[in-house]
Amino acid sequence: MTTLSKILCVLIILLLCFSFRYSLHEDGNQQSSRDFVSTAKAIKYGDVMKKMIRGRKLMMASGEKEEAETKMKRGNRETERNSSKSVEEDGLVAYTADYWRAKHHPPKNN
């Protein structure tokens, strides 16, 4: 009997802790008391940032065309930037993949 009462007590405490984790706001929506929102909810409501900066590159978070970023206007013509990467940016990359092409240097002692 004491084991059953202990288990019941622990379950009640966990239920209360879980219920106090959420708070009702003025508009009646039940939201978490934490400061962050999941990405799925942010995309659903449109609160996601359009651009995010990662390293030295400006990446588009909304899936816009990247072709506009890789083209430059020089005078009257458009030229594409030559990239030395051997891995395309359109999918997952194996952890052991070569990320850069081999660079061919002239012989050292000729």
UniProtKB/Swiss-Prot annotation:
Presence of the UniProt keyword Signal in the record: yes
Hydroxyproline: residues carrying this PTM: P107
Signal peptide: 1-23
Disordered: annotated span: 59-90
GO cellular component: extracellular space
GO molecular function, one term: growth factor activity
Modified residues (Sulfotyrosine): Y99
The entry's keywords: Differentiation, Growth factor, Hydroxylation, Secreted, Signal, Sulfation
Null mutant phenotype: No visible phenotype, due to the redundancy with other RGF genes. Triple mutant rgf1-rgf2-rgf3 shows a decreased meristematic cell number resulting in a short root phenotype.
Basic and acidic residues bias: start-end ranges: 63-88
Entry protein name: Protein GOLVEN 7
Annotated gene: GLV7
